Amino acid sequence: MNSTGVFLASSISDFVHDAEAVVAALKANKSVQAQRIFLVGHSEGGYIAAKVAGQDRSIAGVVSLAGPAFAMDRILLDQMDALNILAGKSESERSTLSKANREIYRLMQDKRLSLDEVKARAVKVIDPLLPVFSPDKSTHETIRTQIMSQLTPNLRQLLSLDVAGTWSAVKCPVIGLVGEMDQQVVPS
């Protein structure tokens, strides 16, 4: 089976469809015991495994490695805070950046706004904070561009996922593992 997709243009929905296609191919393979298919996913792959297992009752189990267990905005806020701690940001700076991230995520989740409208409003949130990211003014345009480039349809879809609802639809056994020292998916 060969993929015809473009990875960088793919969304969570595309990855769910890919995983469903793999499960279908495994079930069609005579040498595979279809009732013993387990899905293993890392990070957002844990969500993808749960989504597939919640829709396909024949899945025998799910292993989620550092996969999401609650809303993606909370996970992303935790990730950013962990990175800001590693970057040596003060409590005040971290609080300011977290507040800005929450506002940007709120804008991204507002379905009434086009992505262009979100970006126009996000610039107004980001620009006053550029000195918190870096005191070096020569880096501000690069930082703004990096942040704005992440405001994509894929991020919008991630922020709209019903993670808890997806997991509650899973009826097979689940093993969820998160590393104690993980800075991307904070164990708490």
Label for each model-derived stretch:
Residues 39-41, 65, 177:
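Short beta-strand immediately N-terminal to the catalytic nucleophile in serine-hydrolase-like folds
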Residues 65-168:
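Accessory cap/linker subdomain of secreted extracellular hydrolases
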Residues 46-57:
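Short glycine-enriched nucleophile-adjacent loop
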Residues 183-188:
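Conserved alpha/beta-hydrolase "acid-adjacent" motif
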Residues 1-2:
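Conserved alpha/beta-hydrolase
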Residues 170, 176-178:
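Short beta-strand/loop motif that positions the catalytic acidic residue
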Residues 8-29:
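Alpha/beta-hydrolase active-site loop
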Residues 32-42:
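Alpha/beta-hydrolase fold nucleophile elbow
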